[in-house]
Amino acid sequence: MILSFEYINSFNRLIPICDSCSNYPIGSYVATYIRLFGKNEFEEKGIYDDIVNISIENEFVGFDGIDAFIEGDKVRIGFYLYGKGDEPEDYDPEESEFEIIDRKELIYILKRWKVFIHKPITDPHYQEIIDTKEAYL
């Protein structure tokens, strides 16, 4: 999966964004998920810590804007996701929309994103291209 990290100008303020550069479905939900990680999400103990803690095998790690579940060495990211036993009575699995990403890749992306959003902005047109294959090197 190929992602880009860059900035957009919103009301004279530069906002970091993550976009998918891939032509296939996987990437759009992942990019949305990454965008929701601001500086505070890295500073506070919580979701990021759960993702990088490989002893956690089954955990909700989503936000208000998108759901995510750790399932061993994979993470499901999408909408209308529930853990086993947490489904509401009227739950229809066909309504769930999600992508599955290797946890190792997600950790790699999040570490790169953390560095990106903490860097001082010296060029508003600066961009980084992230290839998740690098997670396995």
UniProtKB/Swiss-Prot annotation:
* InterPro entries hit by this protein: DUF5376
**What is the superkingdom listed in this entry's lineage?**
Bacteria
Family (UniProt): Belongs to the UPF0275 family.
The name of this protein is UPF0275 protein PM0489
Q: What is the lineage of its organism?
A: Bacteria, Pseudomonadati, Pseudomonadota, Gammaproteobacteria, Pasteurellales
